[in-house]
Amino acid sequence: MSWHQAVWNEPLIFEYKGKGRIGFKIPEEEELKKEISINIPEKLRRKEIDLPELSELEVIRHFIRLSQMSFGVDNGMVPLGSCTMKYNPKIEEEAELLTQNLHPLQDDSTVQGILEVLYYMQKWLAEITGMDLCSLQVPAGAAGELAGVLMIKKYHETKGRGNRDEMLVADTAHGTNPASASMENFKVIYIKSNSEGLVDVDILKEIVSERTAGFMLTNPNTLGLFEENILDIAKYIHSVDAKLYYDGANLNGILGVVRPGDMGFDIVHLNLHKTFAVPHGGGGPGAGAICAKGEMVNFLPYPLVEKKDGKYSLSYIPKYSIGKIATFYGNVGNVVRAYTYILGLGAEGISMIGKMSTLATNYLISQLKNVRGLELIAPYRPRKHEVVFSAKTLAKETGVTANDVAKALLDRGFYAPTIYFPPNVEEALMIEPTETEPKEVLDSFAIAIKEIINTAYSNPKEILDTPKNTSVKRLDQVIANHPSSVTPTYRVKRLREEGKIGSLK
């Protein structure tokens, strides 16, 4: 496929030099004083607000140009493994806009509509995951992980178990799990995979002890494989009254087919910004949910919506709640997006997500499994939502690495897959097509991979020089990631240009 990205010499919006141009008239200070009785002390007032002066047309053109130099799901396939970059139906945006004039401090009686949405989302997500109750208070995925860890920690504290200081984490779990456990001072112990890419149950049995607080894993795992021994794993964890935590990063591969709660999981966190089609990866913020079963319901973050006498209220606080993970009630706008997604698909549509995402992955595998230079752990095992190929042989024979393959894909109109993760796969290319990509796109992606690898064997320099068709060409990654080069704000950029902050050349 022939593809070239736009290249605009577009300045930062703060660098526009116009004067007296406006797109929106802000009331003058004297006008504001007449309307509101706020007198800001002189020492707290800004002398100069330092905002650019632009017309509405200039602002529109600025952001349109930036969008043309960007890439997202609306442009083409984004096969980022463990990210579930599916298409986000645009009707969700209309539904989310309905929340814009609501305020979280309004009295419950004035926001019955949104409370009803939250109430049913709590119920629907519990039903989908096989849990008893869900809290929507967590704002994103990593916050959901932390909430789960806090719940496990508090559970053992209520039992007087100060010795429960070990958190087991599968080496094929989601990448942020160890960090979440470490934040609560747990000693992280990795459970290695066997030759099949699954949790090694024999190793698990040896490590589980009276010091084990819980086990964090996801199913399917990060290799896209279903943990077929999950019921035995749950039995071993529960034998010492530890808790089994489910990371929802990979739920898309089984959604509507099997449920974590039926596998023995005690806590489930969900990413509404992955599985339930809320925009993310530059289109954020995300949104999360944390669900619990049995006695772990008592530890959920508050508040939760309850219904009494036909009225909804944010009055339910679980007995041993870990408290709030964020302010107010989570990212409510994104909860509404996910609500719209579930409502639009219905039970029948939801039941097809896991099946279609699995079909897409295995179709891609059928196209790529015999490609020279690529290897696959347990190639005879079907995958679920994603697949991880190793480009180790390709790198050894041609010098073209997984990173180079990813760069070359950009030149062909595809976003790059996740690379070098999980760490137990050398030169990893983690590909997740999702259920929303049509067969023709999957075929084009497979053809692109084959072309890149064939070129790597015949003319590796051509691949090493990519990307050429993108707005930004290949960066010096050492300089780009060095602390003295990272420029997070316009003010930092300006200070660098003025020589007031050093930079790596």
Curated annotation (Swiss-Prot):
The glycine cleavage system is composed of four proteins: P, T, L and H. In this organism, the P 'protein' is a heterodimer of two subunits. The keyword Transit peptide does not apply. It comes from Sulfurisphaera tokodaii (strain DSM 16993 / JCM 10545 / NBRC 100140 / 7). Belongs to the GcvP family. C-terminal subunit subfamily. It catalyses: N(6)-[(R)-lipoyl]-L-lysyl-[glycine-cleavage complex H protein] + glycine + H(+) = N(6)-[(R)-S(8)-aminomethyldihydrolipoyl]-L-lysyl-[glycine-cleavage complex H protein] + CO2. The keyword Endoplasmic reticulum does not apply. InterPro entries: GcvPB, GDC-P_C, GDC-P_N, GDC_P, PyrdxlP-dep_Trfase, PyrdxlP-dep_Trfase_major, PyrdxlP-dep_Trfase_small. This is Probable glycine dehydrogenase (decarboxylating) subunit 2. The glycine cleavage system catalyzes the degradation of glycine. The P protein binds the alpha-amino group of glycine through its pyridoxal phosphate cofactor; CO(2) is released and the remaining methylamine moiety is then transferred to the lipoamide cofactor of the H protein. Its cofactor is pyridoxal 5'-phosphate. The modification N6-(pyridoxal phosphate)lysine is found at K274. GO terms for biological process: glycine decarboxylation via glycine cleavage system. GO terms for cellular component: cytosol; glycine cleavage complex. GO terms for molecular function: glycine binding; glycine dehydrogenase (decarboxylating) activity; pyridoxal phosphate binding. PANTHER family: GLYCINE DEHYDROGENASE (DECARBOXYLATING), MITOCHONDRIAL, GLYCINE DEHYDROGENASE, DECARBOXYLATING.
